[in-house]
């Protein structure tokens, strides 16, 4: 029988807490005309990347989604990329 005390224990994985890139003093403003900024939060297929991946706060994620949808409607961003 194997003694439980002899089995090596793993250290728990510690994930670094990310901060929202849109909060702070030098944070960029979310604007539907700033296509270069908005493209960083769209996947290569044209979908909006979720906030758990981009670490954007809930309030700013809603603003970001609204700005992306406005830019799509005006033809600044594509709806889908083939």
From Swiss-Prot:
This is Small ribosomal subunit protein bS18. HAMAP family: Ribosomal_bS18. The keyword RNA-binding applies. It holds the Pfam family Ribosomal_S18. Binds as a heterodimer with protein bS6 to the central domain of the 16S rRNA, where it helps stabilize the platform of the 30S subunit. It comes from the Bacteria. Residues 1-20 are annotated as: Disordered. Belongs to the bacterial ribosomal protein bS18 family. GO terms for molecular function: small ribosomal subunit rRNA binding; structural constituent of ribosome. Part of the 30S ribosomal subunit. Forms a tight heterodimer with protein bS6. GO terms for biological process: translation. The keyword Transmembrane does not apply. Keywords: Ribonucleoprotein, Ribosomal protein, RNA-binding, rRNA-binding. GO terms for cellular component: cytosolic small ribosomal subunit.
